[in-house]
Amino acid sequence: MLWVSYGKVSKEGMKGMITNPQDREAAVAKLVEGLGGKLISYYMVLNGDMDFIIITDFPTEKFEENLLINSMLVRGSGAIKSVATVPAMRAADAVGQMKKAQQMASAMLYEAPSKT
């Protein structure tokens, strides 16, 4: 299953990037692989709202099992101010979900509050 993590680098982490510029992709990949996943991509965005986006692929049970460990390791390092992770799917894989929603909508399984 795909997971998208995004977050902010701490002031301390930003100082470290300026003091010792380096590509952190290998370090991120090592952590992800150590937790049973695979790094798909890692981006620095530095736009004010967030500083990085990481896309990983984990078996669901592995990710949920290791989410707290990941959070403790990354946030405990002092380099990261905040991080959030959400599940994701490729657009082509979402078609099945769209079809299921279409079937449910046509069966009127959900009625909006304004309709009752």
Model-derived segments and their meaning:
Residues 36-40, 80-82:
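A short, amphipathic edge element
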Residues 1-31, 38-40, 44-50, 64, ...:
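Short S/T/G/P-rich N-terminal loop/turn motif that feeds into the first structured element of a domain
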Residues 57-87:
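An amphipathic, aromatic/His-enriched active-site/gating alpha helix that lines ligand/cofactor pockets
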Residues 30-33, 74-76:
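Short, conserved catalytic or adaptor-binding loops enriched in Gly and charged residues
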Residues 8, 53-59:
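Short hydrophobic/aromatic beta-strand micro-patches
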